[in-house]
Amino acid sequence: MTDHVLRARELFLDDTNAYGCAEVTLIVLQEALGLPDAGDSSPAMALNGGIAYSGGTCGAITGAALAAGRLAGRCLADHSEAKREARRLVQELMAGFRAEFGSVDCRHLTGYDLDAPGQHEAFIADGTWRVNCMRQIEYTVGRLTHLAREAGWASPPAGDSPTVPPVPAR
């Protein structure tokens, strides 16, 4: 288990439940990729639960998309090229995520309509988020970190030998 996965677990599984999926993913990726203000999760606050509990795209993916954009903007001087490369990384991430979990939509992944009355509370009480959502965060952090390293935008930390999720066959 990598340091990044341990950090994600520390944040996501904390009893205070202070950070959601998108926030944890953004924080951990910002730390892993050496981005400034790594502890700032505020851009991802409303992205948890598939964007404001709407059940849309998984917060782990949207948090990773924010990190990918920040990273591309830091590494590539040309704004158009940075956007293209950030999109490419996120598209690869989403393809692998879909192959691994069957969907990228929170509603399908969780089986809950988190925006409906009582559903978020039921989702939290059921506790499967501690396993299922955690696995999705772990996959996303590992995969985007790997893709960033492949692109030459990040180096593996000393002593960190990550288990890289497989790339799905195309």
Model-predicted regions and their roles:
Residues 32-42, 68-89:
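Phosphate-handling active-site elements
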Residues 87-170:
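C-terminal binding/interaction regions
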